[in-house]
């Protein structure tokens, strides 16, 4: 345990030390310079040692906010643990590197045979795992269909007589479809090729209100039902 002095200056120095946190106070007392605090000189030496250690522990940020010289090179402090936040080569080094490259190119070009770059030797990257990225040599060619071949085959299969008969005949359904188109060109357009375009009259409204004949059975049913109800109430 350190020994403390009883003088007024010693008390003031201890009060200054107590302004710091408890952890710093305990750490300062454990140092070798703060073991004997009976004299003022020892107290001053202890305070100086604690201040030096505290200033060494505090982080130094780039900038002249405290009017102190920077201890680190500001080029190193820009999140150097990331690849994209590092500074590039300096102008002097880049200029020197470019000059060396030019000199090497001139010496290589003096022989008249420029050295092929490694990229020229390699095959250009083509996305062969995609259909549209395959090179020209492996391009899929579309299958060509020749209509003349089909006509020749059909001509061989059917003789001339059957072929003339097929050309002269036309299906009945085709004539029925073509005639209404010419007749109803001026009239309103009806969607007759769908089921719901023009339903037959006997199936409109569920088949109940198509004609007077279809209404009579429904009226008789209502009459019979009313008569039965009247007889039941009379009994």
Curated annotation (Swiss-Prot):
Sites where a glycan is attached? 152
Q: Which gene encodes it?
A: Pomc
Q: Does the keyword Glycoprotein apply?
A: yes
In terms of Pfam families, this protein maps to: ACTH_domain (PF00976), NPP (PF08384), Op_neuropeptide (PF08035)
Q: Name one GO cellular component term.
A: neuronal cell body
Residues bearing Valine amide are 136
How does it get modified post-translation?
Specific enzymatic cleavages at paired basic residues yield the different active peptides.
The organism's place on the tree of life at top rank: Eukaryota
> Which family is this protein grouped under?
Belongs to the POMC family.
Expressing tissues:
ACTH and MSH are produced by the pituitary gland.
According to its UniProt record, where is this protein located? Secreted
Q: Which residues carry this modification: Phosphoserine?
A: 154
Q: Which UniProt keywords apply?
A: Acetylation, Amidation, Cleavage on pair of basic residues, Endorphin, Glycoprotein, Hormone, Phosphoprotein, Secreted, Signal
Main subcellular localisation: secreted
Q: PANTHER family, from UniProt?
A: PRO-OPIOMELANOCORTIN
As stated in the Swiss-Prot or TrEMBL entry, residues carrying the post-translational modification Phenylalanine amide are 87
Q: Could you cite one Gene Ontology molecular function of this protein?
A: type 4 melanocortin receptor binding
Q: What is this protein called?
A: Pro-opiomelanocortin
The UniProt annotation puts the region (Disordered) at 88-128, 169-209
Give residue numbers for the modification (N-acetylserine): 124
What are the BP-aspect GO terms?
A: calcium-mediated signaling; cell-cell signaling; cellular pigmentation; generation of precursor metabolites and energy; glucose homeostasis; motor behavior; negative regulation of apoptotic process; negative regulation of inflammatory response to antigenic stimulus
Q: Where is the composition biased (Basic and acidic residues)?
A: 112-128, 181-205
Q: Which residues form the signal peptide?
A: 1-26
